[in-house]
Amino acid sequence: MEIKENLFKSDRHNSFYLSSGPEEGELIIMTHGWPELSLSWRHQLKFLGELGYHVVAPDMRGYGRSSVYKDHEAYSQREINLDMVELFTSLGKKEAIWIGHDWGSPVVWNMALHHPDKVKAVCSLCVPLGFGEHPENLMNTVNREIYPVEEYPAGQWDYQFHYYENFDDAQKEMDEDPYKLVKILFRKGDPMGLGLPAGTSLTRKNKGWFAEFGGIPDFPIDEEMISEEEARTFAKYLTENTFFGPNSWYVNGEDNQKFNETINDQTLEMPALFVHATYDYVCDTTS
């Protein structure tokens, strides 16, 4: 199954996207998370395209070959929602099945909430409906048996507060070596971590993600998850674009909340699927 490269341009934003399958097929749009690319959906693009769907996976704003912006506000869900509406409209279909992972999940939930007429069904991997706002709103999801409040006041979400309080330091730490960071992040979950605090619960105490190690550790690639060539591709665009855009998705909580307050009825009438990842300890939302 051929995967095609495409570029949609509007007056306000450029969206690079990968596509597969017949253009007359039922449309599926898949949105990636932090810090990824449309390439993250390479296996699903081939599989779903072979089933006869027209499958589209964009580089989200701030990533890859889509538009990159220099102010935090450009990465609000309000702006990202407009990107998706424009891209969807350009594809000439009445509705689509929307699938999102990680930060791509609030994107598809918001399409379902704000534009239900454009959503035949919605699916989210790892992030439930209602996330994407300020991390203060996530405290009710912290399992205090794992994260005693005295030691871990923000639980697994501590790293999100780090972006608000030390954005420049967080970006500098990641920009140091995106290739090493990709090798750390793109790997299977470890069953041995079940029931233990996630490392992200101590980000502020440790003054960053990797300060205690003296920089980003050099881990071997998890070849069951990603190839050397793919890791280099992710690192290439993260190096060119920097982590300013990807990390800015985390610091628009107030505006994201206001955006969703504009909706009168937040009941989804279309089919919806949420898939929780048992070994994703950072995004543990099942407490």
Enumerate the predicted regions with their spans:
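Short glycine-aromatic motifs
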Residues: E2-I3, Y53
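A short loop-to-beta-strand scaffold at the N-terminal edge of the catalytic core in hydrolase folds
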Residues: D11-S19
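Conserved HGGG/HGGXW glycine-rich cap/lid loop of the alpha/beta-hydrolase fold
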Residues: S19-V68, L87, H101
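Short acidic-hydrophobic surface loop/beta-edge motif
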Residues: K4-S10
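Flexible "cap/lid" subdomain of the alpha/beta-hydrolase fold that forms the substrate-access gate
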Residues: E2, N14-S15, L27, Y63-I99, ...
